[in-house]
Amino acid sequence: MKRIAKKKEYTIGRLYILGDEDMEVGVNNRGKSVRTLKNPDQLNRQTYFCDTLEPTWRNLLGVKLPPQLVNESLGRQSSKKARKVVGLTAIPEGSYPVVITKSPRFRRWLPLLVGVPGFSGIRIHSGNMAADTRGCILVGENTIVGRLTSSRATLTKLITTIMAASDQGEAVWVTIV
């Protein structure tokens, strides 16, 4: 997943479907498995799946930022870790395994990102605007500025794709860049 618009009230991204052969598998300094993209050119029209919508992006990892992204009121200071605002913060960049589990809140089977530092219960679900998420990733088509359309149909298609990959023994991860 590549974030393409980090706005004041929301974050828009693009979700791509790649195979294990497109990813470099390694271990980080905490001993956790991580996946990085072998070739950024793989994020293209052929691998594009859908758009995503999340809450406001904050610099939770404390990375160096280009001047146009710096905004202290939004927790966007260069080389300084931001504070998480519960329910209003996009998850940090990284690689997270995905499982499909029954959501008590939504009362249906939904993708769940596992091991997101500082977050719990991060789901991928349907919704149309930033107000529809409390930190989760919404999927759909970004045809209206700051919003998604076709969210339910996109979610159904994504769950089918994840289950098919799992049934074939493939690892299912979301890597956010």
Set out the residue ranges of the language-model regions.
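Cell wall/extracellular polymer interaction/catalysis modules
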Residues: M1-V172
